[in-house]
Amino acid sequence: MSLLDTLQRGLADLDAQGLRRVRRTADTACDAHMTVDGREIVGFASNDYLGLAAHPALIAAFAEGAQRYGSGSGGSHLLGGHSRAHATLEDELAAFSGGFSDAPRALYFSTGYMANLAAMTALTGKAATIFSDALNHASLIDGMRLSRANVQVYPHADTAALAALLDASDAETKLIVSDTVFSMDGDLAPLAELVALAERHGAWLVVDDAHGFGVLGPQGRGALAAAALRSPNLVYVGTLGKAAGVAGAFVIAHETVIEWMIQRARSYIFTTAAPPAVAHAVSASLKVIAGDEGDARRAHLAALIERTRALLRNTRWQPVDSHTAVQPLVIGSNDATLAAMRSLDAHGLWVPAIRPPTVPVGTSRLRVSLSAAHSFDDLARLEAALIEASEAQAVQKAAA
């Protein structure tokens, strides 16, 4: 059988299981109201939690950065591509979210995937053991596989199970790794307990705050700041394409850790640096996030979250107990979840269907992603459409 035959058979299998992914094409800027595939929709799919992706100040900064630095960086960070915009942003990020360390330093990456690969591979090796939450992001898992470290997976958020694994380990280097906000359930990691376990066992704790940075904590400084946690053995990863509304990611840790990553993190060294204009726009985003406007947007988002938690309970499906902008609604089968997504789409609402392998088999769900750009009228439309779709499925199930 040829490679093409194998791939075509694989695609047919995905179709039969309701697992093929389909891209949709946005014709306008990312916002609560946008044009997608030529249709006006209300989007509940993006991670633009503060509604900054189309903010005039960020757009102006992007244009200013392109005018000053050009359209591309021209090289890797170690071979001519590291600009003043990158350096300034790293200093700003360390000052903004590095309060957990006495000597914080930040390192800017082009994507969150690359930042997580760097943290997993540069800080470990064959003599290390990584202790990973079962629901960690795929980029962390891929980084662990590349690291050559021994990986032990503990049940989701189960600190007792983690403690038992740590007690039994004699590894030279121990790394506890966890998302802060879990992207498909919206729940929060037990960060205080994880920090305590790391300190008790001489381990390091790496946290991926992709869905917390900009939203959680005072001024949006992130999940560690929200929990008022400090420790010398922390490595903090954040992304800049979600709440920050631009692109890229960063790692903050003790300055020695960051210097080592500059020397050894392959996903930092062997790639062209992001355009300086992107970093310049992120600097503008940090000003909005940290200011009064950022506080107002977070307050509005918090109100939207509470309203959404209530309205999801009015459906026939199973909401997940989330207090974050990620609000999942578990339906179960792939076919039923896709049918629900199509029903919402007919009402001009874009709510993506999340299926295996992203979530466990039998837990396919709608993932409602909230933004400060949404209004309560948007939520009223969502509630009506969800109730209609869930009632229709209940009737069909009863008649079957």
Swiss-Prot record:
The modification N6-(pyridoxal phosphate)lysine is found at residue 242. Keywords: Biotin biosynthesis, Pyridoxal phosphate, Transferase. InterPro entries: Aminotransferase_I/II_large, AON_synthase_class-II, AONS_Archaea/Proteobacteria, AONS_Proteobacteria, PyrdxlP-dep_Trfase, PyrdxlP-dep_Trfase_major, PyrdxlP-dep_Trfase_small. It comes from the Bacteria. Pathway: Cofactor biosynthesis; biotin biosynthesis. It catalyses: 6-carboxyhexanoyl-[ACP] + L-alanine + H(+) = (8S)-8-amino-7-oxononanoate + holo-[ACP] + CO2. The keyword Membrane does not apply. NCBIfam families: bioF. Catalyzes the decarboxylative condensation of pimeloyl-[acyl-carrier protein] and L-alanine to produce 8-amino-7-oxononanoate (AON), [acyl-carrier protein], and carbon dioxide. Belongs to the class-II pyridoxal-phosphate-dependent aminotransferase family. BioF subfamily. This is 8-amino-7-oxononanoate synthase. It comes from Burkholderia lata (strain ATCC 17760 / DSM 23089 / LMG 22485 / NCIMB 9086 / R18194 / 383).
